[in-house]
Amino acid sequence: MSIDQRLQLITRNAAEIITIDELRKKIESEEKLKGYIGFEPSGLFHIGWLIWTQKVKDLVEAGVNMTLLRATWHAWINDKLGGDLSLIKMAADYTVEVIKNYGVDTTKLNIVDADDMVKEKDYWALVIKVAKNASLARIKRALTIMGRRAEEAEIDASKLIYPAMQVSDIFYLDLDIALGGTDQRKAHMLARDVAEKMGKKKIVSIHTPLLVGLQGGQRMSITEGMEEDDIQAEIKMSKSKPESAIFVSDSREDVERKIMGAYCPKGVAENNPILQILKYIIFPRYNFVKIERDIRYGGDVEFKDYEELERAYIEGKIHPMDLKKATARRLNEILEPIRKSLERKPEFEEMIQKISKSVTR
């Protein structure tokens, strides 16, 4: 694979690369690059997470040594799943199973458990050094990486450790690339700034889009003056709002029902969850999408790239109901092997039931 091909694959569908020039230089160096993504095992796996899962797949195919960090302690600090560490670890196992059955070659991943990292004294020394090189105000601003606001920092003091831990994860693993959703931007920028002060390697940050919830960009908690990445974090698909999310374990019928009831105004692309599912989840897996229609309405039509489909939708050439039916059909094809894998393992069925009863924001 050429340098340009690797760069194209790595950057495909990314919302932001910080910076593209640094990434190109790293690829051109021909050194074996190390990347990572850390995930909080915080509940059921919804399709929004398939966006970064696909990017992990892209990075592996581009020759990057990827680490998957099971951020169990981070989830515990963030009060996920009621702070039940055993349930959090169960959710981590479940997440890895989903990633595997999505098509990521997990034998090529370095899977690291935060439980092992926190046993090392060098790790905690690094956390303190990072904290010493960051202002309290900067740490509090970074709390949005946890899905929390700066004013919530008074809930308990452990929350203030979280951003320093995330930066320390990056340094401890000696990474070249940090992958995350746009909601992780503040942590990655903190890591880049602190790296200069501590003489550490400065990471390239790859930020994937956050899939908007099925209700579209309609959240009462959006206020004037909010930064763009914080706005996107507010309207994203959330496991704590089951009707706004599609879970990989949802039945075919539930997927169809949720898709058919989703926000999808005629001719509108902005914050349209159906179009986003097509762009970020379906088109990266398929060479075309077929819209089936009655001959009275023009008959079937195929689109070989997302831009062509979006253009036709904005121009009113595709009806929302036809778009939804095609999306549900393709999405169920992607989810079917994941569903079957989970069904073959009774322990995951029990896990899903437990997690469903324990999901917290």
UniProtKB/Swiss-Prot annotation:
Record key words, sorted: Aminoacyl-tRNA synthetase, ATP-binding, Cytoplasm, Ligase, Nucleotide-binding, Protein biosynthesis
GO cellular component terms given for this protein: cytoplasm
Source organism per UniProt: Saccharolobus islandicus (strain Y.N.15.51 / Yellowstone #2)
Motif 'KMSKS' region boundaries: 236-240
InterPro entries: aa-tRNA-synth_Ic, Rossmann-like_a/b/a_fold, Tyr-tRNA-ligase, Tyr-tRNA-ligase_4, Tyr-tRNA-ligase_arc/euk-type, Tyr-tRNA_synthase
Function: Catalyzes the attachment of tyrosine to tRNA(Tyr) in a two-step reaction: tyrosine is first activated by ATP to form Tyr-AMP and then transferred to the acceptor end of tRNA(Tyr).
UniProt catalytic activity: tRNA(Tyr) + L-tyrosine + ATP = L-tyrosyl-tRNA(Tyr) + AMP + diphosphate + H(+)
Family matches, as Pfam families: tRNA-synt_1b (PF00579)
EC number: 6.1.1.1
Record's subunit section: Homodimer.
Domain of life: Archaea
Residues binding ATP, per UniProt: K239
GO molecular function, one term: ATP binding
The protein's name in its UniProt record: Tyrosine--tRNA ligase
Assigned protein family: Belongs to the class-I aminoacyl-tRNA synthetase family. TyrS type 4 subfamily.
Binding-site list for L-tyrosine: Y36, Y162, Q166, D169, Q184
